[in-house]
């Protein structure tokens, strides 16, 4: 914090010296020194963006590519929602293999749709953009992600068992007209964060960080750390 300007005056002297702090705001504030007032905060409009979510520009690029691939314009949104719903079942990482062909893409496989997306942004960023749509879709049909049990989720948290769950409440995502059917509960958010932590920990345990391949160092292990050694403190249940 900048200290206020100080004024000193020698005893018996009529001359005063004013010392200004380097970071002090000029008396006449304009340009980048303009001080905002209440009107600004009540009328200003901010464009929400997140580096975890595909941008509108990204979607425009993907839309153009899909048009060239002959994805029907009138069902293109549904093709996107179907792909993202599929990713809620199988995952949205770069290594995920898409299965089959959705009903809205004119026979174009989900794998080809995903490949086109990856030329513009990550598959997870794309899925994050539509996370609220998929959340409502799953709740409406009482159809949680297919692998919720395999991921260790409890039945009461099963709708949070997908790896782009954070997009449900991200303001940069596309929100259905009626909003969320219900917001995620604190327990669901905690379960999703815990699952993400466990997945990262397991992946770290599979990596090899040995500086030497000598058996005295590796002890015969291929990976550098066991899962048990990699796990630190998990969040409370």
UniProtKB/Swiss-Prot annotation:
Record-linked PROSITE patterns: POTEX_CARLAVIRUS_COAT
Region of interest (Disordered), ranges: 1-28
Main location: virion
Alphabetic keyword roster: Capsid protein, Helical capsid protein, Ribonucleoprotein, Virion
Ribonucleoprotein found in the keyword field: yes
Entry GO CC: helical viral capsid; ribonucleoprotein complex
Cellular compartment(s): Virion
One Pfam family named in its UniProt record: Flexi_CP
Classification via InterPro entries: Pltvir_coat (IPR000052)
Signal peptide residue numbers: none
Keyword Ribonucleoprotein: yes
Superkingdom of the source species: Viruses
Coiled-coil regions listed in the entry: none
One Gene Ontology MF term: structural molecule activity
The family this protein is said to belong to: Belongs to the potexvirus capsid protein family.
Cited function: Required for genome encapsidation. Forms ribonucleoprotein complexes along with TGB1 helicase and viral RNA.
Record-given protein name: Coat protein
Natural source organism: Potato virus X (PVX)
């Amino acid at each position: 914090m900048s200290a206020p300007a100080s004024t000193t005056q020698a005893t018996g002297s009529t001359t005063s010296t004013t010392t200004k702090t380097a970071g002090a705001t000029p008396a006449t504030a304009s340009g980048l020194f303009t001080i905002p007032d209440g009107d600004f905060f009540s009328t200003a409009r901010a464009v929400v963006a997140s580096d975890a979510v595909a941008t509108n520009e990204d979607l425009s690029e993907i839309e153009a590519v899909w048009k060239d691939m002959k994805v029907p314009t009138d069902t293109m949104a549904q093709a996107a929602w179907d792909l993202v719903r599929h990713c809620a079942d199988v995952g949205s990482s770069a290594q995920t293999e898409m299965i089959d062909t959705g009903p809205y893409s004119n026979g174009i496989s989900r794998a080809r749709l995903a490949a086109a997306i990856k030329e513009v942004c990550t598959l997870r960023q794309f899925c994050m953009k539509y996370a609220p749509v998929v959340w409502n879709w799953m709740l409406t049909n009482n159809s949680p992600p297919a692998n919720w049990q395999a991921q260790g989720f409890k039945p009461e948290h099963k709708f949070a068992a997908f790896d782009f769950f954070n997009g449900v409440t991200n303001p940069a995502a596309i929100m259905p007209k009626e909003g969320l059917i219900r917001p995620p509960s604190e327990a669901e958010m905690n379960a999703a964060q815990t699952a993400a932590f466990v997945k990262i920990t397991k992946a770290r345990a599979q990596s090899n960080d040995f500086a030497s391949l000598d058996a005295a160092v590796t002890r015969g292990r291929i990976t550098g750390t066991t899962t048990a050694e990699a796990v630190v403190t998990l969040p409370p249940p």
